[in-house]
Amino acid sequence: LQAITSNPVTTTTLARIEPEEAEPGWRLHWSTAGHLPPLLITPGRPAEYLFAEPGVPLGVDPEQPRPDHSRHLPPDTTVVFFTDGLVEHPERPVDESLAQLAGLATAYASLPLQEFVQVLADHHPSDGHDDLAILALRTPRL
């Protein structure tokens, strides 16, 4: 890990999606390095976070193995990856902001993906003083 700082530590998520062989839909595989969990929005259900055992941030212990996770995704499911700048606010616990983001995602899940992401960016629960990045994908309908 090459760094331009004296504290070379960062968080991230590595994920891939592939067609599911056992049932209709897709399979999400992911591993985190201390990053916030992805947000899953399945049609007709409230948004939920994919809480799973996190790995340590990059730069902490490169020899430590990272846990891998897997989840079935039905057709038309949205997965949202985001930086902490979307939810961190100095005046409230991050769990409260995560709940607010999940509620927002549930309320606007039926929007086309680009509009959905724009709503999350425009109405984020953070104070707006940190970097903000959102990556969302929606599985195709079968």
Task: Show which residues each predicted segment covers.
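Regulatory/sensor and coupling segments of signal-transduction and defense proteins
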Residues: G59
